[in-house]
């Protein structure tokens, strides 16, 4: 077997930290294998992915012990540019990996940096667009396509140099089912070509039938390993006991259908919209919406990427003007400014909302109920990070910090935009329980999500938007 990944007694500790994030990792991955590395937020998944693609220790520095090879590149010795033709990476947030403003230029970018001839570049773009079924996206403005479409372009761009190893780091966390299905087809395409694929993921259901081995990371160590057939035999209870998400979502999808557009018996609603049209001048996204939301209730807002869920959230919080229609609060017309004063929104990209130099200061910034700080830190498993800089945390941990800020804000309306995108099963459950507690404050709570496990269990009612 040709070894594409080999870690022998690998430990890694970032500079200025007191503990190693990877501890005595031993793992070998053969050519053509597709493996999935799972584990709770902060278990070391992102750190290991950075070791695989050379970002650590070349760019994000730290102390490396043991030996690690990606293909024939030895970590700590090979320069970062040597990894470019060997390893392709696709990350959780496609915005962080786009370098141009249109899709053609985005796909051309990797080859342009090698000095390839323009005719060859055009030929490779056409070949890959056809192979990965993204011809319809060619020539589009990056800023005018959905999150799922951006992720597909990022996926194709990562493969333009035909790397021997592809790393997928939480690539489905912000995607709807249609977009996940497209990503799955792309991965299957590469697997059939014999490419080595390493998937880091919380959402496991889409990987059924793709993955050859499942690896569990826990506090920086590999604690369990299963061949695919053995992993698929684990019950939902056993998966949850390991802190992992469900492999079968049929039950959750049936519950969502049951909660979908349930008739409301109340006549008077806390927040309501009539004939609301939203979007941008000359470009309406949604038209003639009639919606209602009640205090003390969690409403899930579902729908495919690009349907206008985030645009609706921006409008309801006063961050964006509506095109037409009216919004009411307790049956009285409410202004854009008043909506902003009443609301708090946890954005999909939490990095826009982190300002302070420690987790504690971040959560207390604008807090109306600072006396509950310790309780919230404990509930979201953040106590040990209270003195850490928020930007030094994993994506899932950052997500929990912003959620904590929202919970202490004391606002009358809180909107969460994809709040569990980087969260494992345990922390998704913790967040759900906090939503349940938040209902006692009689706030209007809206959760924009693709997370079927969250929506089915913790949302009282569900509204689905369609294109």
Task: List each language-model region with its residue ranges.
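Helix-to-loop junction immediately C-terminal to a conserved catalytic motif
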Residues: 53, 317
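ABC ATPase NBD Q-loop/coupling interface
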Residues: 67-82, 326-339
